[in-house]
Design a protein with these regions (language model features):
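Short active-site alpha-helical segment characteristic of glycosyltransferases
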Residues: 59-62, 69
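Catalytic beta-strand/loop signature of glycosyltransferases that borders the donor
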Residues: 69-84
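Active-site micro-motifs of SAM-dependent methyltransferase domains
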Residues: 43-44, 59, 80
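Long helical/loop segments within the catalytic core of UDP-sugar-dependent glycosyltransferases
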Residues: 1-53, 64-67, 85-113
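Basic/Trp-rich segment in TM-proximal cytosolic loops or flexible interdomain/linker regions
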Residues: 23-25, 81-159
Length: 159
């Protein structure tokens, strides 16, 4: 971590901070990155989808559908350390960071998946729960994409 350029450490801190603050929304947690789940749940969900980029969080939605909306994430409070991309050359490190962020942005693929699958398989899931999960995905990707612009524009308005 400390061998990475400062700009990458700042980005890694921002990501860690965002992740930690999202733990406050217990009802909106989705699996991602390193998670643990039972093999039974993986089988019931139809295994990981190998055709998508962000399969680590898609498995949550597959389980949500397989269990008719009765599936949730329970956070495990374990010590973690920040990590970041790193290369011997500064510019290559920045390119690697961009590639990492681009991969995370692929999570937007969950929005059409949820809309489609809720129509097909989500008959027993209450409408409010379907709406909640589509909104959480949409709001998260929308705010992530626009937060820099919003801060820049609204930050200049008088109080």
């Amino acid at each position: 971590m400390w061998e990475s350029p400062a700009v990458l450490r700042i980005m890694a801190f921002g990501t860690t901070f965002w992740t930690m603050t999202s733990l406050a929304r217990q009802d909106a947690l989705v699996t991602f990155s390193s998670h643990s789940m039972s093999f039974r749940a993986i089988v019931d969900a139809g295994y990981h989808d190998r055709r998508i980029v962000s399969e680590d969080s898609r498995i949550f939605y597959q389980c949500l559908l397989a269990y008719n909306g009765n599936y949730e994430v329970t956070p495990m409070y374990l010590p973690v350390s920040m990590d970041t991309v790193r290369d011997d050359r500064w510019w290559k490190s920045v390119k690697n960071l961009y590639a990492q962020q681009r991969r995370w942005a692929w999570g937007v693929e969950h929005i059409p998946y949820l809309i489609s699958e809720f129509r097909k398989k989500g008959k027993l899931i209450p409408f409010w729960k379907k709406f909640k999960w589509v909104f959480i995905e949409w709001e998260g990707k929308w705010s992530w994409a626009l937060v820099a612009l919003i801060i820049t524009i609204l930050g200049r308005l008088p109080m």
